[in-house]
Amino acid sequence: MAAIHQGGDVICANSGQGSPKCTRVGKFECKYCRLVKYCGKHCQKTHWKTHISDCRNNPLLKATWRPAWETENRVPAFMGGPRLRVFNFKKKYPWGNMPAFDLLNLASNEGINYKRDLNLLYAASGDIRNCVMTLASVPNECQSPMKVYLNDRDADVVGRNAIILLLALTEDDAAIAADNIIHLWYSAFISQSLYETLNGKIRELVQGVCKKIEGKASNAVLGKTWTFGSRSVRLVLAKKQWLELLASLEIPPGLTVEKAQDIRRSVTLAPERVDYRHRRYFAQPPGDRAGAEKFRGHGVLLPFGAPRDSFTIPNPTLFRDTNSWPMKDDADPINGYRFDKIKGFSCDAPANDIYGKLSFFLQDLVTRFHRRLKSSDIKFHLMNVNAEELHDYVGEILFDRIEIANISDAGYLGMAKTVCYIGPLLKRPSDNPCAALVALFLNAVDEIFDDAEKRKVIEHEIMEVWKYMRPQPPTGPYDASIIVNDVATQQVRDVEKYFDRYMKLQHFDEICEMSGMEFKRQPTIIEAWPLRMKKKPHQKGAKEEFATLFSSSNSGCERYMEWRFRAN
């Protein structure tokens, strides 16, 4: 990254206002904010007039900061009054909202020396993070040929995933590839060099397909395979979607960087959403909320003190027109990874710079992914169909792993239909006893935990929360500490009780009986409740664990299940 030296060091934060830009390594943290580093006292002093607004004069960094609804003595927008429609909801999810995980976890399943072919299906992939995490985590001992199928019903998401793979496979330099991928994926604005790459070798690959289908109907479907030695990418799209993919490599006519930033900020910093932002900020440590506010404002994924002046091109894969930003206001790259892993990642980022740590975390992850691609026999297949129709498109292939995100939630496809339509694509135990379909339930506990249930247990849950968070006497009717306690209660909820009720309500036993499948009582790929609190209140580190979960976007109520066919 522009703000990270090849050796993994942060550049001095003196970005050059009024003096030459410093390019030396930052060695000393600003002691007040611990968000930036300087090479020495001279640069720190020179930069102080600029930095003071992010530092001593930044109210979000003060331990005494309180949300606007409390200081203005009013009801927050998320409480009472008419039910608000979801803000800026365009049904677009370019970034994942659940932490990425290793779908293979070979060490606990087939073994790290596994030699047979491995077939993976991401039936509702969303962004490519789970695939990247999985391939980056494959042990060096495993040299199995792989086929990786990535499907999503949003053609824009499929297109971005294809571009990311092509960026990885057309660039030999791992550092350049990682830099390009991270900014295309997560930054609202990109560098001129990345834009030239998109409109150079990537455009050339896509344009060749578009020329071949010029005379075909708009709904005509065409597949194209690009081969890179032992690696390949096959993309199947309708003609209209191929043309949209080509268009996504170029800035929409008339879209300036200033206009793009205004469009984005009208969502990410919308005045009518201030209470929602402040509710999240109040749960975060000061450095995290300062970093979050800066990312909402600038939209470039870099360490806090890094210069952003080279990121002058609106990301054309996100800005698809001249008047809208595709994501909800709370979309955040951090939501796609384990918050505790980011915070604990060993790197050169300043102690309080959570987005700097994420930058280093992703640099390491994508570099390992790139390394795995270079040394492996991997064939990618990307599709854009409804998940329940996949059996019509994948042919005779069966899969060692299937990941379906949360389409198994009752509000989407549901577990019964998932098992009916997608389950048959899984290998049987005779082919691979470790073959599994991984389902996520994001909403199951909430669906059971209705208002009547809440009234029964709220007092008990609040008392449990207070074992981790010291209660403070309320300062008024809209005291933020009291209001956010309602969010914290999810972290102490008896989720097993409510999920058992959910399984009965959704007839899981009957699903197993009719399908010949079963869910594993002891998961071997991902924990059933991976984000749940592990420590009891009296244990060392419990309060810190509670605070980390509380400051993340997760509740601890997220449930994974691993399904397999019963052995005969």
What is the predicted role of each segment?
Residues A2-C33:
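Cys/His-rich Zn2+-binding "zinc-finger" mini-domains, especially FYVE domains
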Residues A2-G8, T50-L121, S125-N568:
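Domain-level detector for long C-terminal conserved domains
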Residues I11, C39, C43-Q44, L61-T64:
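Solvent-exposed, well-ordered amphipathic alpha-helical segments
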Residues K21-R24, C30, T46, I378, ...:
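Residue-level signal for the start and early helices of compact helical domains
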Residues C30-I52:
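Cys/His-coordinated zinc-finger cores
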